[in-house]
Amino acid sequence: MSTIVDEPTYPYSKKLVEALNQVIPEALARPARAKNFERVHSLFKTKQLHLVLLSKSNAKALLEGSGPFSDFGAVNVRTLYAFGDMLLLVQPDFPDSNVWLLADAFKKIHSRLPGALTPQQIMVLPNLHPSALLAFRGIPIP
């Protein structure tokens, strides 16, 4: 999921979906776009959507309940991957095996995604999902 008001996220989410579907076709990934930050917060907080792509400043605001999310409260999230100034966030209780599969896919395709950090750069990010770290280290799926 991305949001209209966090402008670069929706076009980039379409690139992510296309790349993921090439590596994990059974995922049947497709982009989703919320109309505003309130809707992002609602869908993510209620676990109707498990992944969200936000600019780093908005990702931090979602985690802290600040900035555009100050009226809605903080949300517990983990980082899955980073692309330039954007972070792909995941629900902490999203199945570990799914997080591992996504992280492993990004490990394989990061060079095809504009601005994507390398797995080595991702491994030192704060708040990284533990299963993503396992995938980047080459440790088998949990």
Q: How should each PLM-predicted stretch be described?
A:
Residues M1-K14:
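Extracytoplasmic "Venus flytrap"
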Residues S2-T3, L80-N98:
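A bilobed periplasmic-binding-protein/Venus flytrap-type ligand-binding module shared by bacterial periplasmic
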Residues D6-P8, S57-K60, F94-D96:
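Solvent-exposed loop/turn segments at secondary-structure junctions
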Residues P11-K15, A19, R39, L43, ...:
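Extracytoplasmic/secreted proteins, especially bacterial periplasmic and envelope-associated proteins
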Residues P25-S42, M123, N127-L128:
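Short helix-initiation/N-cap motifs at beta->coil->alpha
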Residues H50-D71:
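A ligand-binding cleft/hinge motif common to bilobed small-molecule-binding domains
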Residues S66-A82:
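Short beta-strand->loop
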Residues S111-P142:
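An extracytoplasmic/periplasmic, membrane-proximal ligand-sensing/linker region
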